[in-house]
Design a protein with these regions (language model features):
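Conserved double-stranded beta-helix
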Residues: 57, 62-63, 73-128
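Short, cationic low-complexity segments
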Residues: 185-195
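Catalytic core of non-heme Fe(II) oxygenases with the double-stranded beta-helix
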Residues: 100-154, 161-166, 171-186
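Short, surface-exposed, polar/charged, turn-prone segments marking secondary-structure boundaries
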Residues: 37-41, 123, 171-175, 193-195
Length: 195
């Protein structure tokens, strides 16, 4: 399967089992920490520094923009992404979600900072993603690379308990690239963007 021809490609076992297990445990604990901090009013409900519970796409579900561990992964996987896409890329941002039972990801295309997008299955119950009308099942460690701004993608209602995904986003290295999603560097929250 060719990324250039099909606008998406699946890489099986792109991330080692050891790294996947670390990321899964890390994000499960991070979600718990965020819940405790919000629930006990240690941080206000509008803080995004520990992630948030809900966004415009998936309400009431834990998500985090620009997590430092995920953004290190974004940089470390860039050579593999360049090899598979045959494009010179720059990192833009990461986003993590811990989907729960009943969640739906509506059919959409991504924004400008997501020219080359990847979804990495970190763990939990399997949940197919549809890309350009094709049903794709990713196991932990598998990555789907796709042209996020061009390919419609979605997920039907989730029937499992939890499914953790990390989204890794890149732009082609060209003058109008959204380097670091308009932040000074990786790892910063989205409110630091220079828009």
């Amino acid at each position: 399967m060719s990324f250039k021809k099909n606008k998406y490609v699946v890489i099986k076992k792109a991330v080692s089992k050891e790294v996947i297990n670390f990321l899964k445990d890390y994000f499960i604990l991070k979600r718990r920490v965020a819940w405790t901090l919000f629930d006990q009013n240690h941080i206000n409900q509008f803080s995004q520094d520990y992630g948030r519970f809900g966004d415009g796409q998936v309400p009431n579900t834990y998500a985090h923009y620009g997590d430092v561990a995920a953004e290190v992964l974004l940089s470390k996987l860039k050579p593999l992404m360049e090899k598979k896409t045959k494009l010179k890329l720059v990192e833009t941002y990461t986003y993590m979600r811990a989907y729960k039972n009943g969640d739906v990801l509506k059919k959409h295309r991504d924004r400008k900072s997501c020219e080359v997008s990847c979804t990495l299955n970190v763990g939990g119950d399997l949940w197919p993603i549809f890309a350009d009308g094709k049903k794709i099942i990713l196991k932990p460690g598998d990555i789907l690379i796709y042209k996020g701004c061009e390919i419609e993608h979605w997920r039907e209602p989730f029937l499992g308990e939890v499914c953790i995904q990390i989204f890794l986003h890149y732009n082609e290295d060209k003058p109008n690239a959204q380097i670091y999603d308009n932040r000074i560097h990786l790892g910063l929250p989205d409110y630091t963007k220079n828009n």
